[in-house]
Amino acid sequence: MNKQTIRDVAWSGKRALVRVDFNVPLDQARKVTDDTRIRAALPTINYLLEQGASVILMSHLGRPKKKVAEEFRLKPVADHLQSLLDAPVNYIQTTTGAEAEAAAQALQAGQVLLLENTRFDPREESNDPAMAEELAKLGDIYVNDAFGAAHRAHASTEGLAKFLPAVAGFLMEAELAALGKALDDPQRPFVTIIGGAKISDKIGVIENLLGKVDSLLIGGGMANTFLLAQNKAVGASLVEADSVAEAGRLIDEAQGRGVKLLLPSDVVVADAFSAEANTQVLSIDDVPDGWRILDIGPETRQTYSQVVSEAKTVIWNGPMGVFELEPFAAGTRAVAQALADSSAITIIGGGDSVAAIEQMGLAEKMSHISTGGGASLELLEGKVLPGIAALNDK
């Protein structure tokens, strides 16, 4: 990565203005139910504190409609962060202006301040330079550690870098190192597994990867559209009629490039979208009318696992079936297990894939678990992410 990081700065006595991604789920009682993203920022926060900086944190939470909404205040996140840090965590109900400036000025080395939800300000999402300039008054150096928001050109992710020296935090650095190395200089065979419901979300990703990978394994609802492009009957399965021609073109392109594009050879079908539905395992040539494909079958699971076992680099994004319903979780679990058993570099992106890995207790077995859904997809598409482009070059 040719961007400056927090290691390139002398922090003693400086105020670090850090964009983190604390967009975490809360329950009815407003308690954090999954703190993965908060924990992911701790190495950066702790390093800055150890180096003698004071730390001012900015994040969004949820999708407030560009105004204050009580249920999206960051107070529960501040409380949770305090339970994970020895340093005192202060929280204020504002993001910019006199109160924020006074709180930032008063902060001592070794202390933390969490600002209010950046998206309460309508100027955040329009990347208004006036908001970025107001935020810049709060710190000396800007640190972007919010990989999950790096694909958005907002005031706190991109605009701010025009007003302060801008460097990457450890999480941002790790994400770029893992995904960047896999895409630019992978150990081969390089295999990508793409799943999830919609092909339309991932056409750009597949397009970009066809120029890089040795094998592409496809599962989830999107596989149905590819199967339809091969004139397979898919019954009442989810398909994107608008994308069938596109899927056919990608199949041809893979062939032309010598990339192995694998689709399910057998599937788990059900007569309804329900955990209580009648199910059967059938060859892809035998899917009856009125039944829907909800998972890859055992033969496909074995084939995909075999390809993974021979790989040196694997990127997995998206589940193989409707993994939240128990009868259709086996495909996703098989892929997760194959990755855990593999000696390859394994990179997991996308919320559902990550959830499957976490649920099975296999997170420790993976080389890298990406915290950014949309951001990692756009990186896989070969796009330049505004939040990263804005950082100072080395």
From Swiss-Prot:
Locations listed in the record: Cytoplasm
Principal location: cytoplasm
Sequence positions that bind ATP: 202, 324, 350-353
Stored SUPFAM superfamilies: Phosphoglycerate kinase
Gene Ontology molecular function: ADP binding; ATP binding; phosphoglycerate kinase activity
GO cellular component terms, A-Z: cytosol
GO biological process, any: gluconeogenesis
UniProtKB keywords: ATP-binding, Cytoplasm, Glycolysis, Kinase, Nucleotide-binding, Transferase
Family: Belongs to the phosphoglycerate kinase family.
Name recorded for this polypeptide: Phosphoglycerate kinase
Organism encoding this protein: Herpetosiphon aurantiacus (strain ATCC 23779 / DSM 785 / 114-95)
Gene name of the encoded protein: pgk
